[in-house]
């Protein structure tokens, strides 16, 4: 079975074609600058051969048509025709309260995704564009929506509700939803395997650290708490997002600076975080280099980032009544030894100690704890695309079995 995984953004379309017989990607590709000048599509095969093409990509449908051409290219493609693709899995950021798991896309699912547009205005509309484009180009191929929020639907009400008038929840669905669920689910499951324990018996704190960062407490394979909330703005400080702050800061700054609601939203989402503090960059490599040369604001930005995460690890240790492991994943979590060291230093009281040499190893599954540490520290590269492909395969196969049983 071959599954095409689609992650459609506002001006980009990431994709992977995965052969599910051995769960390996045949091709990984990206359409960039959709609807903008100088659009480009790049695709890399499993053997390393690369296709790169500059072409006009006015919308997602045209972008997907180029994906079809790339996948079936006589020289650099990986399949002879699109008939070889059995199903398509779509990343959808927000599923609201409706979806506790992935779902086969039909009219009802499409409407539910649209109903969540106001909850994820930057993400769900382009996600839906990707679905629509696929349906037009690949009619009849089963498609599955895999929701970032679904994994967090096991969080209890006392953890996901805000202490606001309850009517706001009833009217507008204002509550914590959580994000990066597909990543947290994948690494939590891998952590259980690395620990040699059944998933149901493992308690882990998963740290997805990239330009957007979130931490999740996972108990027995289920999310019980997470840092991101109603939107991905809540939680720890991030690349350009401020994370959790005193809410009274918002009207205060709006009044002092004369900002509109859209402008304050942009300030908190795109001009804050380590970028806002450092005044330099949201790239942690740049900040590391600047801090090593004595840039005090770069150092402060890194200290804030690490401190906020350290606090959450302590908090979630309490939520779980002790953790078996702390997991680091995503771009920064997998690759930055210095950030991991900043976060974990001084946590020996919680049973967390790392081996300095093992911590230097980048981008591979590894236990970087000292031999006698009570809590294991694991670095696990995330694989959201494989998780989406697995869900898509499982749901499509279940649907086929159901149809067969009904016809009998």
UniProtKB/Swiss-Prot annotation:
Is the Nucleotide-binding keyword given for this protein?
A: yes
Annotated Mg(2+) binding sites: 7, 384
The UniProt annotation places substrate binding at 91
Q: Which domain of life is it from?
A: Archaea
| Note on how the cofactor is bound | Mg(2+). Can also accept Mn(2+).
| InterPro entries xref list | Ac/propionate_kinase, Aliphatic_acid_kin_short-chain, Aliphatic_acid_kinase_CS, ATPase_NBD
Instruction: Enumerate the residues binding ATP.
Output: 14, 208-212, 283-285, 331-335
Catalyses: acetate + ATP = acetyl phosphate + ADP
**EC number(s) from the headed UniProt entry:** 2.7.2.1
* Record: active site: 148
Q: Which cofactor does it need?
A: Mg(2+); Mn(2+)
What would you give as a GO molecular function for this chain, any one? Answer: ATP binding
Q: Where is this site: Transition state stabilizer?
A: 180, 241
Question: Principal localization?
Answer: cytoplasm
Q: Which UniProt keywords apply?
A: ATP-binding, Cytoplasm, Kinase, Magnesium, Metal-binding, Nucleotide-binding, Transferase
Keyword Glycoprotein included in the entry's annotation: no
On assembly, the entry states:
Homodimer.
The UniProt family comment states: Belongs to the acetokinase family.
- Report the function annotation for this chain: Catalyzes the formation of acetyl phosphate from acetate and ATP. Can also catalyze the reverse reaction.
Q: What is this protein called?
A: Acetate kinase
Q: Could you tell me which species this protein originates from? A: Methanosarcina acetivorans (strain ATCC 35395 / DSM 2834 / JCM 12185 / C2A)
